[in-house]
Amino acid sequence: ARLGEICHRYGVIVVADEIHCDFTWWGGQHTVLLNAAPCLRDRCILCISPSKTFNLAGLQVANNIIPNPELRERFVQAKERPAFDECNVLGIVACMAAYNEGEEWYQQLKSYLEGNIRLVEEFVAEKLPGVTMIPPEATYLLWLDFKGPGLPEEEVTHKLLYEAKLWLNRGSMFGPTAAGFQRLNAACPRSTLESALERMRQTFCK
């Protein structure tokens, strides 16, 4: 809310990417930016999509919520430039079907991903000495802290890629304060995740 007030004071247009808003864990709740900072109503573009929740990324469909009619018109005009494509019909129909009929899928998916997150947390605590996992409040992207083993980030990344055959995102990609972390995507079949964790253990616990 405080950041929203600052943006409002200085006339900043805020683009809020809330594509992961459906994934909060164990009773947590996502607060939409416009609820946290109502003062931004006229200067906010809120971006959501069914692509993460319903695995529809290939259909390239998203929703942009722009309460301010003038800002919305500017957005539409910019989108109509030759470099931008319109949503395809199949994507629009799939988006509507997902939001209107996808509650059962969504609840089952959340339960499954919570199980995956618990699996990673327990495995790291029990079988990867020196490595810790930051318990997530939201999303299925997990942060593993590899600073404990004392290896440079470049060496950890190299070992993961060439020995464990795993491609994680190194923390420094997201800024200097994240150096030493690796980001793991837990949104996959549990057997795939178990195999990845075991290869990680074999690589760092020789």
Label the model's feature ranges.
Residues 1-206:
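PLP-dependent class I/II
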